[in-house]
């Protein structure tokens, strides 16, 4: 018998960690926010320029799972947020968390056949091309029942992780997609670029000055995005994962290291990559304890291969709407 768990996740627990993203993700940028400065843990200054993108005109494929369907709601957790607490194995968050009070009615964002697992507060609805999973929901439909668009599926229950419905979307290949991608769920407006909180350089686990690199160096940056709508307490002002993080290294017009993508959240990342993407010190959000999202920008960067003089390390973070933050830090050996 097919179950909701089989359709939503192959790992039967609430915290589990490729669709083609609409070409409008790479939009022209405008309305630059004044550059900000920061300091790494050992004092090397960096600058960041935050830029707001033009508004998207991509039509969403489906509306929200709570009423009103055509109005944006607060989202308190994003796809690929780190999950590493309470004894759970490290994993990527496999959907988004739409904040809503306990007892809120949850509705189907697309038609299909419902799959319900006895004793589990979740419903999956499999359609012609995509399967949608709704977690932390007490089902109001039967197993294998055909459901219509906007049909009542159940009601939000608080299973100890706060008041929300976790929405997951999978394609026919079983890949989890980002519901907040352009052409996914909508309406969704975001005018808040990500933040680069810190940039650290470590040699043998110890911090070194960006202007005196030696040996093999790991570069770690704490980067986070903010939610466009305020999430109700106690989950207000928590960080979320940027959609894309890239880095490059150059000197003048010469590209020393070509641009490399660290994370791309158009789909959920394989769990085996967790320790290659998130550096030690990364924590997920908890009530009263906002998380820290520490990304490996580079690992084992050979200082001896840097050219003489000062080079420029660039870290580029964007969200699903093209809002962008570009951080720059001078480095040398």
Task: Identify the residue ranges that each predicted region occupies.
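N-terminal secretory signal peptides that target proteins for export/translocation
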Residues: 1-12
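Short nucleic-acid-contacting surface segments enriched for D/E, G, S/T with interspersed K/R
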Residues: 141-148
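Surface-exposed, glycine-biased beta-strand/turn segments
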Residues: 35, 43-123, 128, 148-149, ...
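Bacterial N-terminal signal peptides
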Residues: 18-34
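Short alpha-helix capping/helix-loop boundary micro-motifs
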Residues: 99-100, 138-141
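Long, low-complexity serine/threonine/glycine- and acidic-rich segments characteristic of extracellular
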Residues: 189, 195, 204-333
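A short macromolecule-binding patch
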Residues: 130-138
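Glycine-rich acetyl-CoA-binding "A-motif" of GNAT/NAT acetyltransferases
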Residues: 152
